[in-house]
Design a protein with these regions (language model features):
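Short, small-residue-enriched loops and turns at beta-alpha junctions
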Residues: 19-23, 84, 111-116, 148, ...
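Generic structural signal for hydrophobic
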Residues: 4-5, 34, 58, 94-97, ...
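Short secondary-structure transition/capping segments
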Residues: 25-27, 56-57, 78-82, 117-120, ...
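Alpha-helix-loop-beta-strand connector modules within alpha/beta enzyme cores
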Residues: 22-47, 85-105, 150-175, 229-246
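Core AdoMet radical
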Residues: 5-25, 35-94, 103-110, 133-136
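Short, hinge-like loop/turn segments at secondary-structure boundaries
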Residues: 60-64, 84-86, 123-124, 153-154, ...
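Auxiliary Fe-S-binding modules of radical SAM enzymes
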Residues: 128-257
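Catalytic cores of alpha/beta
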Residues: 51-60, 112-128, 182-195
Length: 257
């Protein structure tokens, strides 16, 4: 998959998974192999909460960025969403990432159960205070195998308004037009770009494995196929950008803040 990304002249790759008990050396090996394919390629990890030693070893192996959403900066709400966890651990992990000089990303879902507007405002202020380089914002979409299965999904309107407010306070941040915004009743990613998002994220995971990572139903990227590079590979992404009066940029996209 990374070789396909490199062939497509993309200079950044994200390795994402659930919070597994990874062998630290396995991730190090992946990072080293990616850097051998292209030493200039930025490697972003999204592997959940990890201890300081793992984060340090992955940084030393060549990782450049790390994504770890706060989900809610309100303590009681965070611990309602994440049973048997406390927000202090998440905050410590974010602090460790910044200390280790990762370009650090965080973010939230909008429309979460028991979330209110004040919480979202506090989250936006939390982003601003911590000067994160990347901020992911998308609507909550319930999965039928979770305790929130019967909760209503978040709206595109609330997610887009949150992106606008976040962009105003964080003018240099990388803000993706998230896959979740493309997975509602229609594709809202162009609207997200118009509201302040500036990143699109094609999924190069092989089709067979991609279908096993259904974190919410009807995930947009499940049916997108970027495994064969051709001049039409990015036609959909080019259209999304064009609809927002933008053009695609395939550089590393290093943060400006």
């Amino acid at each position: 998959a990374v070789e396909k990304i490199n062939q497509a002249n993309i200079k950044t790759v994200v390795l994402q998974s659930g919070e597994e008990n990874f062998e630290e050396a396995f991730i190090c090996d992946l990072i080293i192999k990616i850097k051998k394919i292209n030493p200039q390629m930025a490697v972003t990890l999204s592997l959940g909460e990890q201890n300081y030693k793992n984060l340090q070893n992955w940084k030393n192996a060549g990782a450049d960025r790390y994504l770890l959403r706060i989900e809610s900066s309100t303590k009681n709400h965070y611990e309602y969403l994440h049973h048997k966890r406390n927000i202090e651990t998440r905050l410590e992990c974010l602090k460790n990432l910044q200390e280790l000089k990762y370009q650090t990303g965080s973010g939230i879902m909008t429309g979460l159960p028991k979330q209110n507007i004040k919480m979202i405002v506090d989250d936006i202020l939390f982003f601003n205070e911590n000067k994160f380089q990347m901020l992911g914002i998308g609507p909550f979409i319930p999965h039928h195998q979770t305790e929130f299965a019967n909760q209503p999904k978040g709206t595109a309107k609330l997610a887009l308004k949150t992106i606008i407010a976040t962009r105003i306070l964080n003018p240099y941040a990388l803000i993706p037009a998230t896959t979740a915004l493309g997975s509602l009743d229609k594709d809202y990613r162009s609207q997200a770009l118009l509201c302040g998002a500036n990143v699109l994220m094609p999924n190069f995971t092989p089709q067979q494995q991609k279908s096993q990572y259904e974190i919410y139903p009807n995930k947009k990227c499940i049916n997108e196929n970027f495994t064969k590079t051709s001049q039409n590979t990015f036609s959909e992404l080019e259209k999304l950008a064009k609809d927002a009066n933008m053009v695609l940029d395939f550089s590393r996209g290093d943060a400006l803040n």
